[in-house]
C-alpha cells in the first residue's frame, strides 16, 4: 500500500546494503529522503526518486509532506508499519507525534527498549532530538504522543568487525549532529554517555535472548556513544587549531 502523506527520512551513517534495506522497507512512503549529516554519501548510488541531503538539517526543512517518519540506516520498517501509520494519520483526532517500538536483533537476542522513541510526527513537529545515550528521535511534541504497536527493526551484524565498523560510522554521524548544535564535549560526556547508552540496552525487554547477548549489545551501544563524543572532541580541537 502507499501512504503519500508520509515522508520517510533515513538518517544515514553509511551506504551499501544497510541503507538499501532501510529505503526498500519504506518504499510505500510518498517521499524518501536520505539525511547525511556527515556528508559522506555524495557518490552513493540511490534508488530512483530518493533524494539526498548532505549536511545537517531538520526533517521539517526537507519536505512538504504532512508527516515525517524517521529511520536509522540500520533500521527497517516491519511489514505492518505502513498500515498502522496510514490508520493513525487518517484519524480526525490524530496525535501530533507517535512513538514506534524499535526491536534490536543481534547475536542470538531480540531486545525491545521499555520506552519507544518518537519516530512519526507532523512536519511542524519533526525536529531531531538527541537524548541520553545519543539516541535520536523526533520531538518533543507540542502535545501527548500516541503509540503504534508495529515496530522498526534493527538487525545487528553477527560479525564483530562489521559491527564495530558500522558503529564507528554512526558515531561520525552523531558527532556531526552534535557539532551542528554547538554541543561542547565534556569529560563527563565520555563517562556518562556510554553508561546511558548501555543502560538502555540492559533494561530492554527481551523478546528472545541467548546467553550474554544483552551484555554484548550493551557494550556496543556504549562504545558508539564514547566514540561519538571522542570524534566531537577531536573535531572541536581541529576547529580551534584552524582559528590559530
Tell where the protein language model's regions lie, with residue ranges.
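Cell-envelope/extracellular polymer assembly enzymes that use nucleotide-activated donors
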Residues: 5-7, 31
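Short, well-formed alpha-helical segments that are part of the catalytic scaffolds
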Residues: 9-28
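A short acidic, amphipathic alpha-helical/loop segment
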Residues: 21-25, 58, 84
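Active-site regions of enzymes building and remodeling cell-envelope glycoconjugates
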Residues: 30-32, 46-54, 143-148
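Acidic ATP/Mg2+-coordinating residue in the GHKL
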Residues: 36-37
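Active-site-proximal specificity loops/subdomain of glycosyltransferases
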Residues: 40-66
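Catalytic-site signature of metal-activated, phosphate-bearing donor transferases
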Residues: 60, 66-68, 78-239
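Catalytic metal- and UDP-sugar-binding loop of GT-A-like glycosyltransferases, i.e.
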Residues: 69-73
Amino acid at each position: 500500500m502507499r501512504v503519500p502523506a508520509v515522508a520517510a527520512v533515513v538518517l544515514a551513517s553509511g551506504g551499501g546494503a544497510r541503507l538499501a534495506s532501510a529505503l526498500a522497507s519504506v518504499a510505500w512512503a510518498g517521499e524518501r529522503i536520505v539525511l547525511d549529516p556527515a556528508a559522506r554519501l555524495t557518490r552513493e548510488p540511490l534508488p530512483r526518486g530518493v533524494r539526498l541531503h548532505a549536511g545537517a538539517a531538520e526533517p521539517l526543512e526537507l519536505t512538504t509532506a504532512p508527516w515525517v517518519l524517521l529511520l536509522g540506516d540500520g533500521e527497517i520498517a516491519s511489514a505492518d508499519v505502513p498500515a498502522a501509520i496510514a490508520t493513525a494519520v487518517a484519524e480526525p483526532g490524530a496525535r501530533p507525534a507517535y512513538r514506534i517500538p524499535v526491536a534490536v536483533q543481534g547475536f542470538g537476542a531480540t531486545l525491545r527498549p521499555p520506552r519507544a522513541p518518537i519516530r512519526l510526527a507532523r512536519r511542524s513537529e519533526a525536529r531531531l532530538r538527541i537524548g541520553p545515550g545519543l539516541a535520536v528521535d523526533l520531538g518533543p511534541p507540542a502535545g501527548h504522543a500516541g503509540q503504534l504497536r508495529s515496530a522498526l527493526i534493527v538487525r545487528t551484524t553477527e560479525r564483530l568487525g562489521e559491527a564495530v565498523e558500522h558503529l564507528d560510522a554512526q558515531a561520525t554521524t552523531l558527532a556531526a549532529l552534535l557539532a551542528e548544535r554547538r554541543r561542547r564535549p565534556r569529560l563527563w560526556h565520555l563517562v556518562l554517555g556510554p553508561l546511558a547508552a548501555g543502560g538502555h540496552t540492559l533494561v530492554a525487554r527481551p523478546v528472545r535472548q541467548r546467553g550474554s547477548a544483552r551484555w554484548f549489545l550493551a557494550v556496543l551501544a556504549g562504545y558508539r556513544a564514547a566514540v561519538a563524543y571522542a570524534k566531537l572532541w577531536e573535531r572541536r580541537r581541529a576547529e580551534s587549531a584552524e582559528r590559530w
